UniProtKB/Swiss-Prot annotation:
Main function: Binds 16S rRNA, required for the assembly of 30S particles and may also be responsible for determining the conformation of the 16S rRNA at the A site.
GO molecular-function term, one example from the UniProt record: rRNA binding
Keyword DNA-binding: no
UniProt entry keywords in alphabetical sequence: Ribonucleoprotein, Ribosomal protein, RNA-binding, rRNA-binding
InterPro entries documented for this protein: Ribosomal_uS14, Ribosomal_uS14_bac/plastid, Ribosomal_uS14_CS
Species this chain originates from: Shewanella sediminis (strain HAW-EB3)
Protein name: Small ribosomal subunit protein uS14
Pfam families to which the protein is assigned, alphabetical: Ribosomal_S14
GO cellular component: cytoplasm; small ribosomal subunit
Gene3D superfamilies: 1.10.287.1480
HAMAP family: Ribosomal_uS14_1
GO biological process, one term: translation
Highest taxon of source: Bacteria
Subunit-level organization: Part of the 30S ribosomal subunit. Contacts proteins S3 and S10.
Length: 101
């Protein structure tokens, strides 16, 4: 079980990413546009650097929805491998069963 502070930190990051998503996208569009002047590009870079560090989507970490475990996370189910196996063995995941050949 992950510490509740780690779960809270991830929730805070998700909120910041959502809050600054449009602003980040606009600044990146200015930076990546080849017709933008050097001064405008530099201003956009400085503004982008001025945004909170945690507002970048790359700083988010996928975590198990039940335990908060950061490793062994399966995107398709939103669970860690351990909790997915437990749910599968109980028959709670439709269409998923233990492999046998």
């Amino acid at each position: 079980m992950a510490k509740s502070s780690m779960k809270a930190r991830e929730a805070k990051r998700a909120k910041l990413v959502a809050k600054f998503a449009e602003k980040r996208l606009a600044l990146k569009a200015i930076i990546n546009n080849p017709t933008t002047s050097d001064e405008d590009r530099w201003d956009a870079v400085l503004k982008l650097q001025g945004l909170p560090r945690d507002s970048s989507a790359a700083r988010q970490r996928n975590r198990c929805s039940q335990t908060g475990r950061p490793h062994g996370y399966l995107r398709k189910f939103g669970l860690s491998r351990i909790k997915l196996r437990e749910a599968t063995m109980r028959g709670e995941v439709p269409g998923l069963r233990k492999a046998s050949w």
